């Protein structure tokens, strides 16, 4: 049995888009290929690849074909088929960076003292007509499931799955649940490497998408983020808590306000609730780090530009003012 199942989700991308990652996994040094398995989940039965594409790889590849249901449904299907002790979620257009990436990870496993592990990652942006690579600091990585490693049995015991009613922010929602249920934050550990091992790719088209959003699902996600902040208020220092507020709630608000289907009433409801939240904890949290806010804006940039309803400058500015404490109560 493999020690790590890598769950890769695929929608309609050509084989050439994902092939580099399959190739670099085949070049890994210092590991046993029996210890890893790739579960390729095709979101749409018609999107499966010929099996001979995978014949030459030294590790096992299993295709899982499901009716089109979106990224959350695809990842859930991967978890349902996984049997390894640990799992990792990987987009079809992402890549592991070096031929020693898996060695650094596999040397740590099975890591019995941890339920969640994470590694450094970079953001590879192709949306500006050229490749731009940016380092992703720790404080912003928790809006991603990428470059994270989850103990499968712990996820199943706690009933943690992706919310299929959300067609965006499913990563942040998933990790919010993970953090909320992981009562001992010492069960989270970093796999320290010389350089980042994972590259998250940002392109004009997402890997897998589903039309429509659920208003209440996003409201519940927002409340869950607040709950995580409250839960960890006594466990982490003020600086880490401020970072958590910014990277989850601020990112959520921006995406909600840029997505067709979220009602004006829901936008107002979220803004009012978060304003009261910040008022309540203002003395404890203090002023969020400006650099963190800029990083979250960078993470959100592509999503803001690609959504069917653009976010106005006024909305972004007003929300940033709320988060940095420039607005008084009731403003």
Task: Kindly label every feature range from the protein language model.
Residues 196-203, 209-243, 247-257, 261-281:
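Catalytic core of nucleotide-sugar-dependent glycosyltransferases
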Residues 1-223, 234-235, 327-331:
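Nucleotide-sugar donor-binding/catalytic module of glycosyltransferases
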Residues 94, 166-179, 249-252, 301-314:
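A broadly tuned preference for mixed-charge, low-complexity surface segments
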């Amino acid at each position: 049995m493999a020690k790590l199942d890598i769950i890769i989700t695929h929608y309609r991308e050509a084989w050439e888009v994902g092939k580099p990652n399959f190739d670099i996994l085949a070049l890994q040094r210092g590991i046993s290929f029996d210890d890893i398995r790739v579960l390729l989940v095709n979101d749409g039965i018609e999107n499966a690849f010929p099996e001979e594409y995978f014949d030459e790889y030294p590790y096992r590849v299993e295709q899982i074909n499901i009716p089109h249901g979106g990224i959350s449904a695809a990842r859930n299907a991967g978890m349902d088929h996984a049997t390894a002790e640990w799992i990792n979620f990987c987009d079809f257009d992402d890549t592991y960076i070096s031929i020693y990436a898996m060695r650094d990870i596999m040397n740590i496993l099975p890591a019995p003292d941890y339920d969640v592990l994470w590694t450094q990652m970079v953001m590879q942006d192709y949306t500006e007509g050229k490749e731009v690579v940016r380092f992703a600091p720790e404080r912003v990585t928790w809006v991603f499931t990428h470059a994270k490693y989850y103990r499968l049995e712990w996820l199943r015991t706690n009933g943690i799955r992706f919310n299929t009613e959300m067609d965006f922010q499913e990563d942040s929602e998933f990790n919010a649940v993970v953090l909320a249920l992981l009562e001992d934050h010492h069960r989270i550990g970093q796999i320290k490497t010389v350089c980042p091992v994972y590259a998250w790719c940002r392109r004009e088209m997402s890997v897998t998408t589903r039309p429509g959003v659920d208003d209440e699902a996003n409201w519940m996600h927002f409340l869950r983020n607040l709950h995580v902040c409250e839960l960890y208020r006594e466990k982490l220092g003020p600086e880490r808590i401020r970072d958590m507020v910014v990277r989850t709630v601020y990112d959520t608000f921006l995406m909600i306000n840029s997505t067709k289907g979220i009602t004006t009433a829901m936008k107002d409801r979220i803004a009012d609730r978060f304003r009261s939240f910040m008022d309540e904890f203002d003395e404890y949290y203090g002023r969020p780090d400006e650099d963190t806010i800029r990083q979250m804006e960078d993470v959100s940039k592509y999503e803001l530009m690609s959504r069917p309803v653009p976010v106005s400058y006024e909305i972004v500015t007003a929300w940033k003012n709320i988060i940095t404490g420039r607005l008084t109560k009731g403003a």
